[in-house]
Amino acid sequence: MADFFQNGEISNLHRLKPGDAKRLEKELEGFSQKRPIALVLPALFQDLTAKPIKNILSEIAKVNYLNEIVVTLGRTKKEEFAEVKAMFASFNLPVAIIWNDGENIRELYSILEKEGVSAGGDGKGRSAWIAYGYILARGKSDVIVLHDCDIVTYNRELLARLCYPVANPNLDYEFCKGYYARVTNRLHGRVTRLFVTPLIRALKRIIGRIDFLEYLDSFRYILAGEFSMRADLARINRIPGDWGLEVGVLAEIYRNCSLRRICQVDIADNYEHKHQPLSEVDPNTGLNKMSIDIAKTIFRTMAGMGVIFPSGWVKTLKATYLRTAQDFIAKYGHDSEIDGLAFDRHQESVSVETFVKGIELACDEFERDPFGAPQISNWNRVTSAIPNFFDRLKSAVENDNT
């Protein structure tokens, strides 16, 4: 049974009545008449040939409140794109497929580069960003919802609960982030459990109360990739192009929204998707790289807000983080014991030791370059630099889909 505790700086919308999808869907059908909903599905070709996608599409096909679906494909060859088009050809909802590796879209990326509003390199951030642009160019949806295509435990209730807070005009939220537990026979979500939350708590102890850190600490699953937002936010939000995507998006939401317009919603009893390796010896891949990118995003965002990091802060942060994370390991060990879950204390400790090294690398990079790679520009800047870009984007996607 879910709790009903309200903690932190944002509203928590709990799942107190599971199995209520039909009521939610009926209400969403009404809300969508005034606030049409677009669903964005960022995917690699391998996601669309893996086992979970069949169930995901089967569940999506049963809903009647979506106005449009945008599948934004990364790392996809020509013959693979043709296969994906065939997959969606008979789908019962309007589907546009953005082929990010195709000639038409690559030409647009080149134009952006020449005009000084680069969309950065290939990745989920750029794929999501171009999908938002296409939705804005069409101008037919007021709500944008995004989730991944590798969710093993997907069902219609997850989608409905994700859409509902922003689609419902009576609630008046502009941004909603999903949260959930990630449990099989053991606890998952190592980067959230053992890195991000302990890092935020360590920073709070060192630097003191910072509103931005209090805000981040309010999210129950800060790295969840599922969210909904008003389409207007897609015009003004910038997007990171690396593993700092989720935290970077939250930073932009913090910058552009009132806290009263931000919420998080419990979307599932449990959530399972593909797992990333820790990669403890290689900081350029896996959870190791993810932790470094996330830390840099947090440090750079704080610096941009005027936070001054004290002298000697790196050593203090590493020590404080390590102690905090070790305390978290003990808590999760107790959690696992009472619930009869497997718990490998050694592997949990290896993860934390890897993340400590990642913090040092992130701090070094931050001090060397406090700005980092520029974020992907917001769409207002793009259309200011290239007034007819939306028309070009619509034409490119439509040409690829014919």
Feature-to-residue mapping (PLM):
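Catalytic donor-sugar/metal-binding loop of nucleotide-sugar-dependent glycosyltransferases
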Residues: G241, A251-N270
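Short, flexible, basic/aromatic active-site loop/helix in glycosyltransferases
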Residues: N170, E174-R182, T192-F219
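Short beta-strand-to-loop acidic/aromatic patch adjacent to the donor-nucleotide binding site
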Residues: R138-V152
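Aromatic-glycine-rich donor-binding/catalytic loop that engages nucleotide-sugar donors
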Residues: G139, R205-Y221, G225-W243, N256
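Terminal low-complexity segments of carbohydrate-biosynthetic enzymes
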Residues: M1-K17, N92, Y271, P277-T402
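Active-site-proximal specificity loops/subdomain of glycosyltransferases
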Residues: D20, K78-K140
